[in-house]
Every structure is written in structure tokens, then in C-alpha cells.
């Protein structure tokens, strides 16, 4: 605001205080400089405390405006008109006014909440939109809005209106990541306090839940991942009967690899069981075909809440150049907005002992160097993140930062703007995992931390906590950050748009970009592309520079985002190897249909596709055939398991007919053309035919495992052969047997002879550095093995065995307590 002179410009002072009160949650000071101004202030404060007196405010405001006009002071007249406009707008958007109207509930039901400091004094455009669409009245909806427009508060208001109207006593929020579930749980606890029971389920696929939680008289908010919810209903099908409100956050997971199939079948199951009284909300910031999803999921019973006019916090998009400039663009990639000249100063680095070549920083062709340079310069203004396209790149960026320190480069801005105490604590925690000499530990002392999927959960939570509390200013991260984790980032430096070997999806990048300049954290932000080749070669047709530029600029256009597809539909779609080669999806699907009953169906498919590819393109030995076929196998197993669940809870003997109905209820079938629909029906039919060999009791057991029938049968056989319920095994014997069986039935990404030793060290609580000293394997490989192969796959496999074991009266031994404990130890890596 302009400088305020309270003696000559009272309206300006009132306006400043009011905006601080409404937007920044500051105290509202009563202006006693003029009697009429004081009356306006007191009536405003009374209104926001009680919800009463809106008409009186308008009358007092009219009188106050008249008095100011009579004083004939030009600046006071100017500001009193602005003040009147602000107050009238604030009253029209007031929570006291809108929430009772949108929810069709009496104001008294909102009164206690709106009097509390946690309540919003005005509703944001996103919250007004969901109100106007009837979501607060119980209307099911797809909510497609950009990140950072008030989604968390919207979820809270949806839940409050549902509880206040008695439409629901239990709400469940489903989010794709444990980190996101943690964040949502903390937000809900902060918002509701002791009013409701907030229960976050663990992500361990074990029976750590009970229907007894519904006995509590308090309203309940449950939070879990899609896999956990699917696991729960496969064990207790009537669990869903207790839920009145379903909220799916980041609800664009239908085509997320093999997880997508589980997600689609889960939502299809809920969709089929939900009554008109229950409410289903699916939220996503990047659902470009939201209308299509809404027609499938909700039909006439739901609405689409989306408005392109609602924008996220503004962000500037910059491109680095070898000329040391940054060029900024907005909506039109052909029209530059402005540029910042000579923003880089290249500095000579100290030579190491016996080093002759002079080295400089930053190297103007190195995207990572440019990102580090700008991060060091800008982090004093707010949090910065350097995006790395893979975990190995995270390490290389951190190694470069350490090298720069060793060569005498000044990184004081990064370290100086961090909380030294908190960084020391983080460094100590990092040392416990990786050792004192690991680059991650050293980087913590410099104010830099990593963030990626394989980082141990405790460390990742500590890093996110430090970021949220602004204890550090620079994080080097992968695309894991795009999946909904909210930390305060003002500057995002993109070193690459590739993820592994593929270009990042536009919607993934949009989600990543949405982490910057989030409302309530920063009012603006910047995304800077630090690979200078993109800008410098934008007009160059040689080597595809212009094509890469076009692909890059599309990333910033939310309207160009890929439509959300279906993993199940991928079963009948083409396998694309590269721009030259691929396989017709219908032919691949027909092969699977014809050979599905054979044990080696998918191995044979890999062999035939590989032979056909190499016969035509002998050089394409490094291809994605095995990965594509493996994805199809996992998707088929997900369908298989879901049909086991449905058949085990349905007395109808015509399983083919049931399978056909389930197929027709999927998003895949809704999106498919006629030929694809016919193939999908055949796929569901052959799976139903395979399942028809088993009785209800067997199917119930197989459904509980969340895996395919073939592996369930192998587990049954292994349990019987090893007399698990007849012979008492020590824990050591049990671990060895399980690891051996796991290796027989699973394929590791890398053949590792010391896998059993790593498992034992993991169970003993050894750190990565201790494992590295014993095995000589790179720490990055050990991270991958422990977080994926052991913590997820092996612990899940032990859970499968637990689900299949049946304890009878004649059994001598009950191995379940030991197996349950072992499952948790494998999950968390503790003794």
C-alpha cells in the first residue's frame, strides 16, 4: 500500500487493516479517528464474529462515504470509494453468507465453525465454484482445478457440509502416496481438531484395521492409499457400507501403469455400490478429459466442477542461454515477453593439486551448473528446487555442489539462508543411513537436501518438514515431487524434461510446476529451464532443435495436457517401441487370449515379439518389449484378482455373464472403440473361464491376496510342502525359506547373488553404508533393492502367504504371529 497518513487518510488506513484481516488473518484494529469510520469498523468486526449485521454495514458505509465526500479531501474520496467496493465484495463472498446458501443448511449449523479462527472469512473462487455446482449439498462431482487454488480447504468444507447435514458420519480420502496421505492427515487434524476422529491407515497390506472403529460416536475421516482401500474391501467387503463420502485426491491414476488397473477396478466397484445418498468426489489438477471421466463415473448423477478462468498463482517461465541471458515467455512461445541480460558471471575455480587445466563455473553448456548458479543467487528470496530426471542425477548435482565448495566457490547464500541447527539434525539423520562421508550428509551441512522416491521414508518426512518450516532453501528432487507433496518452492530449475528414457508427460510437468508459488506460501514464482540448447537451437531445424523447442513449450500449456487413459484399455492398444517400430495391439491381445491358459503365455509373447523385432531391426536389442509385456501380465492379474473378489461375494453361477457386466462398467470399455470393446470382453471372458474352476472358499482366499491365481496356487503348494502349520520353524529358518521362495517366483531387476544377505542386514536394521561395506554394491542399488524389492515386494509377498494360510483345529503350529511380525520388519527394516 501507499504510505498511510492516519491524520489525513482514514479510509486508506481502514482499507489496509481490512485487507490484512481478510487475506492475511491479521488482527483488525478499530479506527477511532472518526466516529463514522469507527462505526464501520466495529460493525465489520461484529459481522465476522457473529454473521449478523450485513445490512447495517451497508447503511453505515453509505453514511461514512457521504461524510468523506462532504470533507472534500481528494485522496480520502478516492480511497473511500475503493474501501466501499472492497467491503461490498467481501460481504458478497463472505463465508457467513455463502456456506449456508451453498449447503442449504441453517446458519446455526455453521456458526461454531465460522466463529473459529480456522474458518475462511471469504471463499476463494474454487470454493465458490464447488458451492455453485451443488457439491456442498451432496452432489457427486469431478473437480478439475489447477494446483494451489484452495483444494485442501475445499475438501474440508465438503466434509464439514456432509457431516453437518448428516449425509455421512464417515468420510474416506484416498491419495496415491504415503507422503500425501501423511500431509492430508495432518491438514485434517489441524482443521478439525477433536471434533472428529482422523485415522490414517498404514500402507502395509495387512489386516491392521477393524470395523470396530465405526462404533465411535464421533464422525470419522479415514485416509489411505488406493491399494490399501482395495485390500481392506477384499478382506471385509461390508467396509464400504459404512462410508458416506468418498474423496479421491490426485484422481488421474487410471493409466498409471499396473496401479492404474487396480485404481480403475476399485473406483468401478465403489461406483457400482454407491447409493444416491452417498457422495463421490474425484479431484485432479491435470484431468484434461474431465468431462469424459465425469460421464463414465457419474453420468447424470454428478457434475463437473471446472473453470478455466480460475488460475493458479502466477509464474514466470524463463529459458537460460549460453549468452548468459534469461528469456521469459508467457502464453505465446513465439513472442518473448522480456529478458534479463548478462545474468551469469562465469568465475574461475581453484585448481586441485597437480591440475593444469583451468576450470570455470558455471559451464555455460551444462544445465546442472546453470541451475546451481541461479539457485545460489536466488534462494535468499525463497525456496528453490533443482529438478533431476533420475536418482543418479540427484547425486551428480549434489556432488557438483560439494566440488564447488572444495574449489573455493562461494555457496554462502544457500547455507546462510538455511537454519543451521535444523540442517545439523538432518545431517546427523542422513549420516545414520548413509555414513558421515556420503555426499548427502555433506550436502546437508551446506544447506542442500535430496528428495526422491527411494529416499527412506523417515528421511523424506524430515526433509519435507524442514522445507515447510523454511529451515532450508534448496532441494534437489525427481518427479516424485510432482505427485502432490506440498513444500514452499518459489524457484523451480528444470535441468531436463526427460524421465528415464522418455519425455515427461505434460500433465506430470504441470503437476510439478504446480509445486511452485503455492497459495499461502508465495504469491509468485518462476520456472527456469536451464538447458541452454533448448532456447539457443529453437530455430534450428538441424538435429531437431525446433522440434525440441516446440515440445518444451507445450509442457507449459495446460490445455495441451494428455487425456487420462486407462491401463486396462492398454491391453488392446499398440505396443510402441520407438518412432520406427511397434506391434498392433489387437494382434498382441489375440495372442494373449489364445494362450492365456498356458503357464508360459507371457514369456512366449516376449520371445515372439523380440524375434520379430530383431529380424527386422537387428540393432534394436535395447527395447521395451519385456517391460510392455510385464505390464500386460500385471494388469491381467489385477483383473483376475478383482473377479475372484466379485465371484466370492456373488452366488450367481453364471460367471461369464458377471465378468461381461464388470467389463462393460470399466472406464476402458467406455473409452474403447467397437473392436477394442469386443477384445476387452473376450479378455474378461477368458479370465472368468480360468476362475470358474475354483469354488467360493478358494476364490475368497485368492481375492484376499491381491495377486493372480497362478501365484496363489504356488503359495498354496509351498505352504503344504513345507508343512507350515505342522512344523515349528525358527525365525531364521522361516526367513531363509521365504527368501528362497520369493526368488523362485519373482524376477529382480538386477540379478544379485547376495540378495539373502541384504535382506538379513535390512532385518537387522543395518544402514546403507554398512550394507555397502559388506556387499560392495553401490548405495543407489542398495536403496532400490531395500525400498522396492524388500520393503514393498517381499513384505507384500509375505502378506500373500498370510492371507492364504488357514488355521484348522488339527493344526499343531500357528505361524501367523511370526509371519505378521516378519512382514512389518521387512516393510520398515527394523529388528
What residues fall within each predicted segment?
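N-terminal helicase ATP-binding lobe
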Residues: 1-831
Amino acid at each position: 500500500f501507499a504510505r498511510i497518513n492516519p491524520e489525513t487518510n482514514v479510509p486508506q488506513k481502514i482499507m489496509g487493516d481490512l485487507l490484512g484481516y481478510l487475506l492475511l488473518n491479521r488482527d483488525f484494529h478499530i479506527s477511532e479517528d472518526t466516529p463514522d469510520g469507527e462505526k464501520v469498523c466495529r460493525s465489520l468486526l461484529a459481522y465476522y464474529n457473529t454473521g449478523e449485521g450485513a445490512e447495517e454495514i451497508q447503511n453505515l458505509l453509505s453514511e461514512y462515504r457521504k461524510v468523506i465526500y462532504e470533507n472534500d479531501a481528494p485522496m480520502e474520496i478516492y480511497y473511500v470509494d475503493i474501501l466501499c467496493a472492497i467491503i461490498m465484495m467481501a460481504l458478497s463472498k463472505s463465508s457467513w453468507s455463502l456456506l449456508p446458501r451453498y449447503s442449504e443448511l441453517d446458519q446455526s449449523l455453521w456458526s461454531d465453525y465460522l466463529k473459529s479462527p480456522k474458518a475462511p472469512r471469504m471463499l476463494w473462487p474454487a470454493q465458490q465454484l464447488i458451492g455453485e455446482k451443488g457439491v456442498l449439498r451432496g452432489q457427486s462431482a469431478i473437480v478439475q482445478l489447477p494446483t494451489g487454488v484452495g483444494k485442501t480447504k475445499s475438501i474440508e468444507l465438503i466434509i464439514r457440509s456432509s457431516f453437518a447435514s448428516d449425509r455421512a458420519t464417515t468420510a474416506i480420502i484416498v491419495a496415491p502416496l504415503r507422503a500425501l496421505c501423511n500431509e492430508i492427515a495432518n491438514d485434517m487434524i489441524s482443521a478439525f481438531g477433536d471434533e472428529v476422529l482422523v485415522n490414517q491407515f498404514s500402507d502395509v497390506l495387512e489386516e491392521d484395521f477393524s470395523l470396530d472403529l465405526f462404533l465411535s460416536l464421533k464422525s470419522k475421516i479415514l485416509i489411505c492409499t488406493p491399494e490399501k482401500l482395495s485390500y481392506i474391501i477384499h478382506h471385509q467387503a461390508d467396509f464400504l457400507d459404512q462410508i458416506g463420502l468418498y474423496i479421491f485426491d490426485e484422481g488421474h491414476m487410471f493409466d498409471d501403469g499396473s496401479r492404474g488397473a487396480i485404481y480403475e477396478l476399485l473406483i468401478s466397484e465403489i461406483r457400482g455400490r454407491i447409493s444416491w445418498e452417498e457422495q463421490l468426489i474425484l479431484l485432479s489438477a491435470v484431468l484434461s478429459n474431465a468431462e469424459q471421466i465425469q460421464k463414465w463415473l457419474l453420468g447424470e448423477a454428478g457434475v463437473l466442477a471446472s473453470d478455466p478462468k480460475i488460475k493458479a498463482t502466477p509464474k514466470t517461465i524463463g529459458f537460460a542461454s549460453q549468452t548468459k541471458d534469461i528469456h521469459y515467455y508467457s502464453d505465446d512461445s513465439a513472442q518473448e515477453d522480456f529478458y534479463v541480460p548478462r545474468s551469469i558471471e562465469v568465475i574461475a575455480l581453484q585448481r586441485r593439486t597437480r591440475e593444469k587445466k583451468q576450470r570455470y563455473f558455471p559451464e555455460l553448456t551444462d544445465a546442472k551448473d546453470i541451475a546451481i548458479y541461479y539457485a545460489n543467487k536466488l534462494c535468499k528470496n525463497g525456496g528453490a528446487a533443482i529438478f533431476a530426471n533420475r536418482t543418479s542425477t540427484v547425486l551428480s548435482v549434489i556432488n557438483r555442489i560439494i566440488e564447488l565448495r572444495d574449489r573455493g566457490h562461494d555457496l554462502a547464500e544457500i547455507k546462510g539462508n538455511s537454519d543451521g541447527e535444523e540442517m545439523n539434525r538432518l545431517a546427523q539423520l542422513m549420516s545414520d543411513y548413509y555414513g558421515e562421508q556420503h555426499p548427502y550428509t555433506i550436502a546437508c551441512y551446506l544447506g542442500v537436501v535430496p528428495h526422491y522416491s527411494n529416499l527412506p521414508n523417515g528421511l523424506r518426512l524430515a526433509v519435507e518438514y524442514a522445507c515447510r518450516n523454511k529451515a532450508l532453501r534448496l532441494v534437489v528432487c525427481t518427479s516424485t515431487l510432482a505427485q502432490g507433496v506440498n513444500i514452499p518452492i518459489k524457484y523451480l530449475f528444470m535441468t531436463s524434461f526427460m524421465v528415464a528414457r522418455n519425455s515427461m508427460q505434460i500433465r506430470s510437468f504441470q503437476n510439478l510446476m504446480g509445486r511452485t508459488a503455492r497459495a499461502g506460501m508465495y504469491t509468485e514464482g518462476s520456472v527456469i529451464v536451464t538447458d541452454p540448447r533448448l532456447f539457443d537451437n529453437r530455430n534450428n531445424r538441424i538435429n531437431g532443435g525446433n522440434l525440441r523447442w516446440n515440445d518444451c513449450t507445450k509442457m507449459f500449456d495446460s490445455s495441451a495436457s494428455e487425456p487420462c487413459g486407462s491401463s486396462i484399455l492398454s491391453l488392446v492398444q499398440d505396443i510402441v517401441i520407438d518412432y520406427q517400430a511397434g506391434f498392433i495391439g489387437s494382434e498382441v491381445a489375440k495372442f494373449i487370449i489364445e494362450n492365456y491358459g498356458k503357464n508360459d503365455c507371457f514369456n512366449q509373447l516376449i520371445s515372439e515379439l523380440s524375434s520379430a523385432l530383431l529380424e527386422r531391426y537387428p540393432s534394436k536389442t535395447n527395447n521395451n518389449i519385456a517391460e510392455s509385456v510385464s505390464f500386460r501380465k500385471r494388469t491381467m492379474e489385477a483383473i483376475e484378482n478383482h473377479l475372484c473378489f466379485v465371484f466370492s461375494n456373488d452366488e450367481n453361477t453364471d460367471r461369464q455373464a458377471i465378468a461381461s457386466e464388470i467389463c462393460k462398467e470399466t472406464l476402458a470399455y467406455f473409452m474403447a472403440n467397437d473392436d477394442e470393446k469386443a477384445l476387452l470382453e473376450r479378455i474378461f471372458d477368458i479370465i472368468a473361464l480360468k476362475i470358474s474352476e475354483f469354488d467360493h472358499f478358494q476364490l475368497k482366499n485368492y481375492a484376499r491376496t491381491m495377486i493372480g491365481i497362478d501365484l496363489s496356487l504356488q503359495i498354496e503348494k509351498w505352504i503344504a510342502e513345507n508343512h507350515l502349520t505342522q512344523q515349528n520353524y525358527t525365525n531364521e529358518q522361516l526367513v531363509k525359506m521365504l527368501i528362497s521362495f520369493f526368488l523362485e517366483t519373482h524376477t529382480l531387476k538386477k540379478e544379485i547373488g547376495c540378495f539373502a544377505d541384504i535382506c538379513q542386514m535390512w532385518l537387522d536394521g543395518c544402514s546403507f553404508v554398512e550394507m555397502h561395506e559388506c556387499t560392495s554394491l553401490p548405495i543407489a542399488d542398495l536403496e532400490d533393492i531395500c525400498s522396492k524389492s524388500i520393503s514393498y515386494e517381499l513384505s507384500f509377498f509375505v502378506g500373500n502367504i498370510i492371507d492364504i494360510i488357514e488355521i484348522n483345529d488339527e493344526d499343531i503350529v500357528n505361524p501367523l504371529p511370526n509371519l505378521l511380525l516378519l512382514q512389518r520388519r521387512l516393510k520398515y527394516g527394523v529388528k
